[in-house]
Amino acid sequence: MNFRAFLLAAIAGIATINATEVNRVNHDQVQPFAQPEPITDSQKSAVKYKPQLHISYGCHPYAAVQTDGSASGGLEWSGRVDGDCTGSQLGSQVYSRSDWYHDKWAIMYAWYFPKGRYHLGGHRHYWEYAIVWTDSPTSSNSSIQGVSMSAGVGYGKATPPMLKYIDGNSIKFDSHFSLLGNKAALQLTKEAGERQDLITWDQLTVAARDTLNGDALDGKAWFTDKDEVPFKDDIFVKRLQKAFPF
């Protein structure tokens, strides 16, 4: 292939990529999925252990994607840490994906934030997540064995968490400013938080899963690792492996 043909092919490839980019929606106009009635054991367990999220720093969580696959446009990171992101009138969302890992049933819960701030900058799209480890996917015959959460650096872990951090079956998390990581991160808290409508990976539409599996909702900054959707196909098991607390 000569240089001219190569250049034309490259231009055509760029045009194809641009043509298949997802539709963007203002961050506060993304319509969350309504929480459906759980049917499978996995779905029932995800609902049983749905956590609470208290916000002491940064944005409140928002929906990341809607039924047609349209994605949040996010927010510029500049300005106040909670500027234009104190909550959507349409409601919020917590995403979940579950599977066996070693001999534990892992339930990941993930929250999307339209921007992430660091001392030196920030980026659009930010994710925080926690993994509740149980001994069975059957909601009627399982109990909490441990918990892991995305921290300032690495993961916070407890096996099991202390009772003061649990309300019934719901672990309470706080999104706070981590001095070590210089960013928003999760920690256990005694404070009550909000519970968002839950949508599990298998309850999402194909269009929504396709968007989440791409990079449209990954946070990117030149000075940090890419903040990827933690429950997408090629990332989920890697996150379980790194967060495993036993």
Swiss-Prot record:
UniProtKB keywords: Glycoprotein, Secreted, Signal, Virulence
Signal peptide interval: 1-19
**Family listed:** Belongs to the Necrosis inducing protein (NPP1) family.
The record, for Pfam families, names: NPP1
Residues spanned by motif Hepta-peptide GHRHDWE motif? 122-128
A GO-annotated cellular component: extracellular region
Q: What is known of its domains?
A: Key residues/motif important for the effector activities are degenerated in most NLPs, including the nlp24 peptide consisting of the conserved region I (11-aa immunogenic part) and conserved region II (the heptapeptide GHRHDWE motif) that is important for phytotoxic activity.
Where does it localize?
Secreted
Q: Which residues are glycosylated?
A: N141
Is Signal among this UniProt entry's keywords?
Answer: yes
Task: Name it.
Answer: NLP effector protein Pc118548
The protein's organism comes out as Phytophthora capsici
**Its biological purpose:** Secreted effector that contributes strongly to virulence during infection by P.capsici. Induces cell death in the Solanaceae, including Nicotiana benthamiana and hot pepper.
